[in-house]
Amino acid sequence: MKLNRRSFVKTAGLGGVAITSSPFIDLLGNLPRKVEVQNPFNRVPVSLIIDDSTCLVNMAHYGIPQFAEVSPNQYKQDWRKLPREIPDTFVREFGEWCHENSVKGKYSVVPYPACTGWISRFIPGWTKKELEDSLNLIREVIVPDWDIHPEMVSHTRVIDIKTGKPYPDPTPAFMENWEWSQTKSSDELAAYQAYALSIIKEAGLPCEGLTTPGGYAARNQNNLALSTLQAVQDVFGAEIPHYFRDLFTDKGKSVAPQVLHASNLNGTDPKCVVSILGCTSDWFGDWDGLHPGSPDMFITEDLLSGRMVDVIDSAEPAIMVCHWPGIYFNGDKVGFNILKQVVKRLNQKYDHLVWMKLSEIARYWAAKELTNIKLDGNILTLNAPFATPGFTLKLNFNPRHPGLRIRGEEIKPFAKVNDKRAIKDHTWYSDKAGSILCFNLEKGSNELVL
């Protein structure tokens, strides 16, 4: 029985892949054989999305007056009291703490932050050396654990990419957060996004995806997906582009990544784009750094409830969302301290989480959704358009001596572990309910000999 992942999911929901013939006996007697793709390393992915970050500039200080010019009744914060800078000393403190505690995710670098200056050239108010040091800090401390995204060009005014200047009219029609993007074609969005991505590239930063500022393309999502695929591949050559646009906080609503516009899956140049969904609102310190949140919104002190508990217990990726000004909170670090409490509580409650970058989650979900799986006797064949580490399968039967064969090479036996928590690359676990196998899925043909 040969299934691609989309039909495979439907079958799995009714009991998995049913195989009626087999040369060996399993512990479940005559039940139909099932193969189901699990989470990576049999763990629940968790991640943190950081919006409104960039080099040096406090986006709240410079952004609020630009938003207020368009909507004066909505943006009444006293932006002059906010610091103009979020210092690199805090970037280092935050990045090093996250690294020590395995926290990973996405870190925006707004290319032309609130129209103050270009991260790849200069930003008035800071020296050239200060900007270079800030970029070096991001490369050395942030990049190892975080995906870098542009959050379009300025996050405030729309830029005329022919001139590099903001359009003259301060109206919703020419703000990145609001109306400009809602009626643009995929080619128009791709050109604008490529402009932002090219600044990230010129600054010497890696990138596989992008983040939308505010309501950017909220009513134009198909073109957003197509334009992300086009722009990220054109500028950076990323194999699996991804983007963050939406979050959902309603209990029971799926927040699983969405694999979109898959094509040429059996060819030499397969394509897709992945929409990453957040599962929380900003309950850290808000986008302006003026409204303290609470760790209880994520996970309560008794560890029994909260949005992260809901999502983790559903086994979907639990991806928190915050804004850099709220993490710094004008030097009081309110959001940062809330993050520390949340991570501490998650560690107290769970022992089956894995922190991942958004690109790592996107890659796994692309492989999970698009790999063709065929079980024939004691041979399980997986034809994968994309490789991914930690690919994990659950079988409702127990093989005797499972091994992996890649492209006709010798069979490499799996090492057996006696605890699910010990599952890692090229190991397997079994009990009365069946078995779990974990391995690095290679692009192309993979054979599991069971």
Question: Which residue ranges define each predicted feature?
Answer:
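Catalytic cores of secreted or luminal carbohydrate-active enzymes
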Residues: 333-367
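Active-site-adjacent pocket scaffolds in enzyme catalytic domains
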Residues: 30-40, 45-47, 53, 127-128, ...
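Active-site beta->alpha N-cap acidic-glycine motif
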Residues: 32-147, 154-156, 194-217, 296, ...
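Short catalytic/ligand-binding loop motif for oxyanion handling, primarily in non-cytosolic enzymes
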Residues: 55-58, 113-119, 156-162, 216-222, ...
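C-terminal beta-sandwich/jelly-roll accessory domains of carbohydrate-active enzymes
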Residues: 368-450
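N-terminal secretory signal peptides
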Residues: 1-3, 7
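Well-ordered, non-membrane alpha-helical segments in soluble/globular domains
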Residues: 80-94, 125-135, 186-194, 223-232, ...
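N-terminal export signals
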Residues: 7-27
